[in-house]
Amino acid sequence: MNVLSCSINTLKGLYDISGVEVGQHFYWKIGGFQVHGQVLITSWVVIAILLGSATIAVRNPQTIPTGGQNFFEYVLEFIRDVSKTQIGEEYGPWVPFIGTMFLFIFVSNWSGALLPWKIIQLPHGELAAPTNDINTTVALALLTSVAYFYAGLTKKGLGYFGKYIQPTPILLPINILEDFTKPLSLSFRLFGDILADELVVVVLVSLVPSVVPIPVMFLGLFTSGIQALIFATLAAAYIGESMEGHH
């Protein structure tokens, strides 16, 4: 009976944890719309971190970069390499977009593990990484969709839509469906990974001593960085594909 009671209490604890993480939200009313306030708060914090870091790093640029300037130039070079590899020689105008996506997702993912969101109490719900919310990841995926449609139409005009009947008109439904599955796969992959990572850490912290979840937290940081890179790489690949033709 003691074992059964312990098991029931453990399952109840897991249910309570998952309910707090997933089901409750702090809503704001903005212009007649209901938005998730905690997502806006954490997104603003992430944006402030990015803008503040960039401002501090480049406020006094040197010919021979050092410190923060050197780090940001390395990050910029890395983003340029990713963009050039996926888009091709016309990658230049898309570096800011790909870089913004990568940095926002990277810092958002890491903020869920490194920033003490729990100390800020809300009337409902709790603060977590912005990418922990499906609304954020869907918005990022839709922005990517708009970007690759814009890239294709700018490069080819209305001839861009010819890709839907290549290599044969029979594939028209499948080619149309592909454009719907791209944002779905981008958004749910990122959302699922970040949500699962945070839930696993919370469950382990509640069940075992604090030292045990640390390796899982480090693994979560690694996978969070990989997810940011995957999202940015796929976004660049979709843009490059729309400019070059259907593959």
UniProtKB/Swiss-Prot annotation:
The keyword Aminoacyl-tRNA synthetase does not apply. GO terms for cellular component: chloroplast thylakoid membrane; plasma membrane; proton-transporting ATP synthase complex. It comes from the Eukaryota. GO terms for molecular function: proton-transporting ATP synthase activity, rotational mechanism. The keyword Transmembrane applies. Key component of the proton channel; it plays a direct role in the translocation of protons across the membrane. Belongs to the ATPase A chain family. F-type ATPases have 2 components, CF(1) - the catalytic core - and CF(0) - the membrane proton channel. CF(1) has five subunits: alpha(3), beta(3), gamma(1), delta(1), epsilon(1). CF(0) has four main subunits: a, b, b' and c. HAMAP family: ATP_synth_a_bact. This is ATP synthase subunit a, chloroplastic. It comes from Panax ginseng (Korean ginseng).
